[in-house]
C-alpha cells in the first residue's frame, strides 16, 4: 500500500482467525516487535457505545429494546439480537462498516503512515478487507480451546459463542485463504517465536 503524498510505503498486514483464537495476543506481540496495531472491533465499538453518533439508526434497525434505562444503547442486547439474526447482523454491518473504513483510512494516512501495520479484522475474508492488504495472516488455534477462552473472557454461554462463530467462515477456510499462518496451539512462548519468524519474513517483504 503506497501513500499518495509520500514515497514512504505503508505495509498493511491483515490478521484474522477464530474467535478466542489469539488474534489480539499475536497482534500485541507484533506491536512489541515494531508493528503499528489497528483493531477493527475497537473502531466499530464506538458506534454501539452509549454516546454512539448513529443512535437513531441503531434504534430504527434493531428496535428500542436495545436501549437501557437511560436511553443509551446496550452492547450486550445488541449482540444478543444480531448474532441470532443473520439478516439484522448483515444490515448492522452495512451501517457500521463504511464508518469504520473511513476511520481506518484516516489512521493509515496519519499516525500509521509509512509503518508496518497489523490490522486485526475478525471478518477479514468475509468482507473485502483482505483486498486492501499487502499480506494476510490467519491464527491457527484449537477450536474447543478457543471457545472455552471466549466463554471465560466474555462471560457468555457456549451457545452465544457458537452463534457468533456461525456468522464467520470456518477456520479451515480462513487458513486456506491466508498468505501466512501463525500456529497458536502451544504456550505463549511458542506463539511469540511464531510471531518473531513472521515479523522477520514480513520485514523483508516491506524493505
Swiss-Prot record:
PROSITE patterns reported for this sequence: DPCK
Location in the cell: Cytoplasm
Keyword terms: ATP-binding, Coenzyme A biosynthesis, Cytoplasm, Kinase, Nucleotide-binding, Transferase
CDD domains: DPCK
Protein name: Dephospho-CoA kinase
A UniProt-annotated Pfam family: CoaE
Swiss-Prot/TrEMBL catalytic activity: 3'-dephospho-CoA + ATP = ADP + CoA + H(+)
Similarity remark: Belongs to the CoaE family.
PANTHER family linked: BIFUNCTIONAL COENZYME A SYNTHASE-RELATED, DEPHOSPHO-COA KINASE-RELATED
Positions with a binding annotation for ATP: 20-25
Pathway per the UniProt entry: Cofactor biosynthesis; coenzyme A biosynthesis; CoA from (R)-pantothenate: step 5/5
UniProt-recorded Gene Ontology molecular function terms: ATP binding; dephospho-CoA kinase activity
EC supergroup of this enzyme: transferase
Transmembrane region(s): none
GO biological process, one term: coenzyme A biosynthetic process
One GO CC term on file: cytoplasm
Residue intervals of the DPCK domain: 12-207
Chain's role: Catalyzes the phosphorylation of the 3'-hydroxyl group of dephosphocoenzyme A to form coenzyme A.
Enzyme Commission code(s) on record: 2.7.1.24
Amino acid at each position: 500500500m503506497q501513500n499518495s503524498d509520500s514515497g514512504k510505503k505503508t505495509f498493511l498486514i491483515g490478521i484474522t482467525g477464530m474467535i478466542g483464537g489469539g488474534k489480539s495476543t499475536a497482534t500485541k506481540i507484533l506491536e512489541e516487535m515494531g508493528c503499528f496495531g489497528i483493531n477493527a472491533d475497537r473502531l466499530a465499538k464506538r458506534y454501539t457505545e452509549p454516546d454512539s453518533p448513529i443512535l437513531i439508526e441503531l434504534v430504527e434497525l434493531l428496535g428500542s429494546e436495545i436501549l437501557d434505562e437511560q436511553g443509551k444503547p446496550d452492547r450486550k442486547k445488541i449482540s444478543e439480537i444480531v448474532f441470532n439474526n443473520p439478516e439484522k447482523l448483515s444490515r448492522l454491518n452495512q451501517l457500521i462498516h463504511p464508518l469504520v473504513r473511513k476511520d481506518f483510512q484516516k489512521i493509515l494516512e496519519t499516525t500509521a503512515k509509512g509503518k508496518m501495520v497489523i490490522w486485526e479484522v475478525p471478518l477479514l475474508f468475509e468482507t473485502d478487507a483482505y483486498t486492501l492488504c499487502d499480506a494476510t495472516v490467519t491464527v491457527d488455534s484449537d477450536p474447543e480451546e478457543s471457545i472455552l477462552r471466549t466463554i471465560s473472557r466474555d462471560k457468555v454461554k457456549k451457545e452465544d459463542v457458537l452463534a457468533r462463530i456461525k456468522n464467520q467462515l470456518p477456520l479451515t477456510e480462513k487458513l486456506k485463504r491466508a498468505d501466512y499462518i501463525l500456529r497458536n496451539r502451544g504456550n505463549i512462548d511458542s506463539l511469540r517465536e511464531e510471531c518473531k519468524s513472521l515479523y522477520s519474513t514480513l520485514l523483508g517483504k516491506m524493505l
